[in-house]
């Protein structure tokens, strides 16, 4: 199976990349590195079934080339910093809304079998206790 993982150099995205690369799937990791880190995926760069694409989900032309032969998309690309969203609301809108629309449109255009769109912990509000554990209310 050929997978596209947007935001693949982030914390969760890099874990997904590693999981599927080690299972033998072809993985394309797309990240703009605004919050993701090359350190998170450096150990995957030598795998033949792993491809890193430095780019942005706002770039329709790039997505057109990348999504073309993909079976499955994990969309984890987002501007995730709440404080930054107040300072740069247009950037947040462009990435989180317009970028996601681009991913969905390419998935439709190329008849991608499945897409999983991730949210963030911010939808749950502020944590009552830090650090958060598995039993957190």
Predicted regions and their residues:
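N-terminal Rossmann-like NAD(P)+-binding domain of SDR-like oxidoreductases, especially those catalyzing
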Residues: 1-137
């Amino acid at each position: 199976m050929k997978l596209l993982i947007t935001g693949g150099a982030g914390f969760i995205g890099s874990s997904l990349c590693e999981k599927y690369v080690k299972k033998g799937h072809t993985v394309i990791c797309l990240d703009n590195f605004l919050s993701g880190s090359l350190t998170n995926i450096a150990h995957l760069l030598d795998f033949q079934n792993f491809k890193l694409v430095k780019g942005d989900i706002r770039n329709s032309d790039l997505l057109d080339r990348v999504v073309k032969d993909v079976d499955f998309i994990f969309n984890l690309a987002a501007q995730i910093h709440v404080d930054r969203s107040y300072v740069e609301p247009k950037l947040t809108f462009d990435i989180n809304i317009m970028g996601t629309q681009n991913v969905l449109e390419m998935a439709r255009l190329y008849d991608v079998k499945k897409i999983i769109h991730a949210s963030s912990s911010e939808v749950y509000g502020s944590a009552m206790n830090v650090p958060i554990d598995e039993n957190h209310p």
